Amino acid sequence: MMQESATETISNSSMNQNGMSTLSSQLDAGSRDGRSSGDTSSEVSTVELLHLQQQQALQAARQLLLQQQTSGLKSPKSSDKQRPLQVPVSVAMMTPQVITPQQMQQILQQQVLSPQQLQALLQQQQAVMLQQQQLQEFYKKQQEQLHLQLLQQQQQQQQQQQQQQQQQQQQQQQQQQQQQQQQQQQQQQQHPGKQAKEQQQQQQQQQQLAAQQLVFQQQLLQMQQLQQQQHLLSLQRQGLISIPPGQAALPVQSLPQAGLSPAEIQQLWKEVTGVHSMEDNGIKHGGLDLTTNNSSSTTSSTTSKASPPITHHSIVNGQSSVLNARRDSSSHEETGASHTLYGHGVCKWPGCESICEDFGQFLKHLNNEHALDDRSTAQCRVQMQVVQQLEIQLSKERERLQAMMTHLHMRPSEPKPSPKPLNLVSSVTMSKNMLETSPQSLPQTPTTPTAPVTPITQGPSVITPASVPNVGAIRRRHSDKYNIPMSSEIAPNYEFYKNADVRPPFTYATLIRQAIMESSDRQLTLNEIYSWFTRTFAYFRRNAATWKNAVRHNLSLHKCFVRVENVKGAVWTVDEVEYQKRRSQKITGSPTLVKNIPTSLGYGAALNASLQAALAESSLPLLSNPGLINNASSGLLQAVHEDLNGSLDHIDSNGNSSPGCSPQPHIHSIHVKEEPVIAEDEDCPMSLVTTANHSPELEDDREIEEEPLSEDLE
């Protein structure tokens, strides 16, 4: 066997060398083919490349074996020379693959290959390994590129899908909007007649309401004219006034236009105002005719013009004030542009107080701002409630007056002449039965309290029992006079005073004391006292400069108010002992109370004069102003403003009246202000000058000026 192998190796040594070269060339070619194939087709996998290399190596080994066999047959002698260069078949089979270290040792031990052949094999092996690494890297790169391409494609597809979805949504929204618009257009096309009909119906309803209101206003105006006509005729029959024929015929001419009989007008008047049935003969009851909407007016024999009627706000739905304003617009041109709702250039509508330069501007303001609307109606309803409360209080005050007169054992029929002529200024209404006692007609006198006019009469004018119960609402002072705590009167009507613009019937000193006593530590600063006034009474939320001056004056005037300096600053406290001493002096009639009375009249004489003048025999009729017979159904809103009780509060220079009313009971105590007659008029007889419709602004100013005199007396 050894000889055969040796001969084969010797004879085929050259062929082996050629085979090795061909093998290496084939391997190089295979590697080049692999590279070219890898370059051309990036999709060929490494597994296919390995198979391809193995197949090439097997083919090269087979060719090598075939060459060795053929060369061994041709030259067996040259095998000995070429033996060191012979490569066994097993090594040729291993060349394409990686040679392990064990195989290398076996090859070296057997000394089959020379060092050159080993180097060639190692180089070939390294080349193959490099090719494999390059192929693997290339494959990895290809895979990454493919993966990136796939990701990009997926992202693009997702974006396209999202865009498609958005487009679909937009299309759907557009379709929905188009459908809605089409539906609206269809509805508008289907229902144009309904909207027009609704508008026409609304316009018709508004026109009907306006027509009804106009008819109602005309009827009310005609009723008022009829009532005024009837009242003037009754006064003319009594011989109290003389009415020219032309003036009396004006209301009569307007009656046939209404198309209503007097009975129908009277029934409509009852339904509107809610008053009781008309009394045909109001003289029998010794009071006023309750059906008159305006105050009864009388004129003197020398003047032919009647005084303007006094209207009130107690008509339902707030229509009386507007109608009265329209009714009076013609008569105001003749009577010097006077109106109940207009005084001193200011509109007297509740809560208005707009400044009007002249009467024409006032009429425009009244027709524009206070027309028949919801606001005016609500204000009139509030005024109606105030009047109802005042009527209830009036009945109580009448009972109280009768009880007082019974207690004092004063008979009105006892004639007691007055020791000295006095000018008694009082706001007293008169009844019709008193007008019957004397046919004398009286001159018209101004109604302002600042310039009283004393008409010449044949004897002293007196207050009769028939006129006393008809006294209107006045400012009351009984909380101080009768030692009744103020808190017991304010508490039940706290909400009323807080919301209604009504003057509280208390002195400033009493209010200041109440504010301090209600505080937690019984002390208040001046600003805190102001805050209490505005918080408790709605009346003090206006005219701040007027009443704040009065508060400061009272604080500095009265000894019962003590100024204390503390951490808060200057605070005011109440000396209760001094306050009670002041009250006791006022009740017992201390001589200091009569310091304003002239020395010629003592306290007793002044008291007797006031009571005797008030309760003397009614020998002569009570002199009156034509505009002072108020409507009893309105609660006698025109008030008495002066004090009759000289023994309790002899001179009340601070007692002004407010145009509002108070919800408290006992508000109608009678006050008569006694004033000495001026020197040149001492020979003139005593008279009563009635006053009404005081201006709140003038009275507030008057109160500030007279405060030093009044507060010491209280």
From Swiss-Prot:
Residues 421-425 are annotated as: CTBP1-binding. Residues 698-714 have a biased composition (Acidic residues). The keyword Transcription applies. Residues 291-304, 437-458 have a biased composition (Low complexity). Residues 1-45, 284-338, 437-464, 648-667, 677-714 are annotated as: Disordered. Residues 387-408 are annotated as: Leucine-zipper. A zinc finger (C2H2-type) spans 345-370. It comes from the Eukaryota. InterPro entries: FH_FOXP1_P2, Fork_head_dom, FOXP, FOXP-CC, TF_fork_head_CS_2, WH-like_DNA-bd_sf, WH_DNA-bd_sf. It is found in: Nucleus. The keyword DNA-binding applies. Residues 325-336 have a biased composition (Basic and acidic residues). Transcriptional repressor that may play a role in the specification and differentiation of lung epithelium. May also play a role in developing neural, gastrointestinal and cardiovascular tissues. Can act with CTBP1 to synergistically repress transcription but CTPBP1 is not essential. Plays a role in synapse formation by regulating SRPX2 levels. Forms homodimers and heterodimers with FOXP1 and FOXP4. Dimerization is required for DNA-binding. Interacts with CTBP1. Interacts with FOXP1. Interacts with TBR1. Interacts with ZMYM2. This is Forkhead box protein P2. It comes from Macaca mulatta. The gene is FOXP2.
